């Protein structure tokens, strides 16, 4: 089943708010919408989407400034905040005419964006599968100890050099949170959107500055609190793909996720970018989840 380093599907492009955004859109029927986070792209789902072939319209979008989507110009520290990403993604999903039986498959910042969208469009959501997600606002004590100093540095002036010049999120954080070594071809695919030093890498710095930690940024904390409260009560069917050992959805956040109603849980091997360690297990679980939601 594995495609290895080969991308799944063919990239399509659409103009959103004056910028060109990239997405994959394969198959027909009700959509299964796969959304990546930082610093990845739709490429993250290449070995998972094939498991869902024939179960619906398979869509994976590249966030603005990431993957093959356009960069924002002018760029700077104020760009690529959560609210700006949400504006672009909302408009893209609206343009894709998703209908009212959407299954969301979300990870990392794709989870925050997806959970937020689902709360605001709950009547259109058939189910939510999530993994290594931003399920609620957190404190620094909840953050993985081995990564805490680095992520605190990202939120300081030091982050500018670490990310914009040294490309630390792609070169260090990404491979460091995958259990297996990535091939040169796989690393090349992840590097490609961020080869140029400077503002081209801004999305990968803005994202860690948006994590709702210790009350900041206030707008993202409020959004995460709202969707966390909703998910903890919503009857919408859920699939929690737990990671062992995991990185983000661990400890207090994992315990909170396990309280959500109408939820199935499986566990797969992986740290944070678990799609690179357990794609077949993840793909099979998502396919089984969709089949239960959409019996023939």
From Swiss-Prot:
Changing residue 38 to D/E/F/Q: Loss of activity. It holds the Pfam family Abhydrolase_1. Chloride binds at residues 38, 109. GO terms for cellular component: periplasmic space. GO terms for molecular function: haloalkane dehalogenase activity. Competitively inhibited by the key pollutants 1,2-dichloroethane (1,2-DCE) and 1,2-dichloropropane (1,2-DCP). Belongs to the haloalkane dehalogenase family. Type 2 subfamily. Monomer. This is Haloalkane dehalogenase.
């Amino acid at each position: 089943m594995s495609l290895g380093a080969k991308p799944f599907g063919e990239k399509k492009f659409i103009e959103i708010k004056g910028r060109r955004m990239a997405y994959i859109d394969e198959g027909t029927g009700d959509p299964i919408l796969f959304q990546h986070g930082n610093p990845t792209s739709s490429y993250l789902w290449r070995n998972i989407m094939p498991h869902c072939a024939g179960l619906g319209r398979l869509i994976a979008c590249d966030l603005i400034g990431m993957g093959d989507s356009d960069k924002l110009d002018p760029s700077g520290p104020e760009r690529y905040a959560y609210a700006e990403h949400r504006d672009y993604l909302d408009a893209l999903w609206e343009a894709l005419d998703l209908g009212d039986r959407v299954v969301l498959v979300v990870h990392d910042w794709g989870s925050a964006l997806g959970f937020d969208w689902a709360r605001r469009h709950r009547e259109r959501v058939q189910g939510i599968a999530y993994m290594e997600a931003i399920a609620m606002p957190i404190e620094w004590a909840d953050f993985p100890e081995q990564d805490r100093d680095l992520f605190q540095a990202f939120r300081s002036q030091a982050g500018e050099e670490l990310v914009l010049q040294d490309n630390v999120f792609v070169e260090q954080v990404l491979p460091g949170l995958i259990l297996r070594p990535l091939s040169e071809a796989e690393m090349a695919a992840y590097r490609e959107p961020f080869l140029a030093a400077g503002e081209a890498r801004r999305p990968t710095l803005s994202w860690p500055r948006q994590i709702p930690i210790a009350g900041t940024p206030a707008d993202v904390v409020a959004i995460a609190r709202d969707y966390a409260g909703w998910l903890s009560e919503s009857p919408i069917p859920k699939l929690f793909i737990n990671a062992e050992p995991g990185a983000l959805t661990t400890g207090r956040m994992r315990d909170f996720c396990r309280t959500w109603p109408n939820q199935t849980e499986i566990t797969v091997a992986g740290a944070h970018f678990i799609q690179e360690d357990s794609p077949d297990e993840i793909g099979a679980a998502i396919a089984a989840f969709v089949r239960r939601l959409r019996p023939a």
